[in-house]
Amino acid sequence: MIRRLACAAALLALAACGGDGEYGRTSFVAAGDIASGCWRGDEATARLLDDIDAPVVATLGDNVYPSGTDREFRQCYDRSWGRFLDRTRPSVGNHEYKTKDASGYFNYFGERAGPRGKGWYSYDHEGWHLVVLNSDEPLDRGTEQHQWLVRDLERNRGTKCTLAYFHHPRWSSGKHGGKERVLDAYRALYDGGADVLLTGHDHHYERFAPLDPVGRVDPERGIRTFVVGTGGAPSYRMRATEPHSEALGDDVRGVLRMVFHPDRYEWEFVAIPGRRFHDEGRGECH
């Protein structure tokens, strides 16, 4: 059931971009919570990726269920999203850690997953800086990962637009809700000038207004956060809608496509056929 639809005047801009794929030029596409055993939602979202034809496919954790084993990656993930492996930039989720040290994840993605046993890394794409974190490893201030994040953001201060992604959301109206465990990382991203944050974990789609680390609307410096746990796994029941949630779709599967510009971005949530939920819009970098 669709709880709320958000309308924005970006459809014409997205359609006018031109370029590759049925959807016009696309810079980047993302979703998490993907391949779930005999459930075939991941095959439906993979067909969307065929049509969108983005140069970067980002995963937002929980790539395969239930335990992220080598066998599950081969037999489940690989048959659907695996065909985009050469352009995938993954992040790891809690279900991968049901296998010791998330070994199935690191074995499957190899160097694409960042340093083995860590899983955090960054890269540049179309003039944007993208930061991938491991929210199953400590992110508190002073930890190895947090220190790396602060240094990485400082080194890339000259980049106008920054996007980060990891598995556990800072805010969510879904079953699991927002996680305090990522607060220090969110604060570092905010201080470092990040513009967009993508997460998964809860199996729905949600978009929040640009917020500061304690959840206040901040149009000037706030990070626009998305929950995109819609890669194929079964949906969860929703809780009460969190403050400043601007778009919310449950019982929906699909992917978030983005178009990057030097100082701004456009987004569009594309649902699988038969699901009528849609969200799109645009934002400016800080």
Which role does the model predict for each range below?
Residues 17-75, 139, 144, 151, ...:
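N-terminal active-site segment of His-dependent metallophosphoesterases
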Residues 50, 66, 70-162, 176-191, ...:
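Extended active-site neighborhood of metal-dependent phosphoesterases/phosphodiesterases
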Residues 32-33, 61-62, 93, 166, ...:
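Active-site flanking residues adjacent to catalytic metal/cofactor-binding acidic residues
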Residues 132, 265-269:
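Short hydrophobic/aromatic-rich beta-strand segments that constitute the beta-sheet cores
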Residues 1-6:
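Bacterial N-terminal signal peptides that target proteins for export
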Residues 28-30, 58, 130-132, 163-165, ...:
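Structural motif
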Residues 10-18:
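Hydrophobic h-region of N-terminal signal peptides that target proteins for export
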